[in-house]
């Protein structure tokens, strides 16, 4: 049930499949949840500005049923995204949402 969605203004990200797998493993590790439940998304070429500039930037959404650690996760994911895309951590926003189990569906049911 953990989800990470990375939106970036970059037109493309080299080896995006590898980045998605890295994000998946990192999110499973950070939340302590099985990777079998992790979903990763990468959206490129999103029209975006940050601080009044159209230089490359990213917006990251992380959702989970509990297990969120915003300070540690912000550091880890900014570092990972910066190393793989070249987008400075100072141009990355990370937003977190702790979702109720009854509000998250999968496989025909909700988790709570």
Language-model features, listed with the residues they occupy:
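Interaction-mediating elements
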Residues: 1-112
């Amino acid at each position: 049930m953990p989800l990470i969605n990375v939106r970036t203004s970059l037109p493309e990200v080299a080896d995006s499949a590898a980045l998605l797998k890295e994000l998946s493993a990192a999110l499973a590790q950070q939340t302590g949840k099985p990777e079998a439940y992790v979903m990763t998304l990468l959206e490129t070429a999103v029209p975006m500005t940050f601080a009044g500039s159209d230089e490359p930037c990213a917006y990251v959404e992380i959702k989970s049923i509990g297990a969120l650690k915003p300070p540690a996760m912000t550091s880890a994911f900014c570092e990972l995204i910066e190393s793989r895309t070249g987008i400075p951590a100072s141009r990355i926003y990370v937003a977190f949402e702790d979702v109720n189990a009854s509000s998250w569906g999968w496989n025909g049911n909700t988790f709570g």
